[in-house]
Amino acid sequence: MHDRCLKAWVTGRVQGVGFRAATRDQALTAGVTGYARNLPDGRVEVLLCGESSAVDRVVRWLWQGPPASRVTHVECEQAEDPPPGTFELG
């Protein structure tokens, strides 16, 4: 069940450091669906859909990221996107 969908844009050293794959791992562990994809401006866009507490847990992790990353900002907004059935990398 998807209580909530949230879209996040993560800024910093987040491309080429395993950020999307680590985000997928965190999301799947939390039971959250969505996607993570690189943007041309160097950010990563993340869609998270799931129980509110699980989405919040992954958002908190986005501020940390995997060891090779350096997150400087995470911007979030509620999303109206239809919830996907899995977590995809783009």
From Swiss-Prot:
Domain Acylphosphatase-like: 5-90
Taxonomy of the source species: Bacteria, Pseudomonadati, Pseudomonadota, Gammaproteobacteria, Oceanospirillales
Organism: Chromohalobacter salexigens (strain ATCC BAA-138 / DSM 3043 / CIP 106854 / NCIMB 13768 / 1H11)
Catalytic activity: an acyl phosphate + H2O = a carboxylate + phosphate + H(+)
Family annotation (NCBIfam families): PRK14426.1 (NF011000)
Record-stated family: Belongs to the acylphosphatase family.
Active site, UniProt feature: 20, 38
EC id: 3.6.1.7
Record GO terms (molecular function): acylphosphatase activity
InterPro entries, per the entry: Acylphosphatase, Acylphosphatase-like_dom, Acylphosphatase-like_dom_sf, Acylphosphatase_CS
Keywords of this entry: Hydrolase
Source domain of life: Bacteria
Protein name as it appears in the record: Acylphosphatase
Signal peptide stretch: none
